[in-house]
Amino acid sequence: MAKKSLIQREKKREKLKQKYQAFRKYLKEEMSQTLSIDKKWEIQKQLQSLPRNSTPTRIHRRCFLTGRPRANYRDFNLSRHILREMIHACLLPGVTKASW
């Protein structure tokens, strides 16, 4: 189980991402359409002035049951350990164990 503080930190990053997402997208579109280098430098300074935790790359997917940051399956939003337990307990319908 992950520490509660780490899970809260991820939630805070997600909120910041949502808050600045539209403005960041606007600045990036404006930068791609601008030809002047001076204007691009100004836009880059504005981008750098945004909070670091508002970038989408700082957000890490976590298991929603345990908070484990590694080995997550996107389809289920679960870590591999919990996914395996739930499959064996028949809690995920339609998922079968592979055999060949």
Curated annotation (Swiss-Prot):
Signal peptide: none annotated. It holds the Pfam family Ribosomal_S14. InterPro entries: Ribosomal_uS14 (IPR001209), Ribosomal_uS14_bac/plastid (IPR023036), Ribosomal_uS14_CS (IPR018271). Keywords: Chloroplast, Plastid, Ribonucleoprotein, Ribosomal protein, RNA-binding, rRNA-binding. It is found in: Plastid, Chloroplast. Gene3D superfamilies: 1.10.287.1480. It comes from the Eukaryota. The keyword Mitochondrion does not apply. PROSITE patterns: RIBOSOMAL_S14. One of its GO terms (biological process) is translation. GO terms for molecular function: rRNA binding; structural constituent of ribosome. GO terms for cellular component: chloroplast; small ribosomal subunit. Binds 16S rRNA, required for the assembly of 30S particles. HAMAP family: Ribosomal_uS14_1 (MF_00537). Part of the 30S ribosomal subunit. Belongs to the universal ribosomal protein uS14 family. NCBIfam families: PRK08881.1. This is Small ribosomal subunit protein uS14c. It comes from Anthoceros angustus (Hornwort). The gene is rps14.
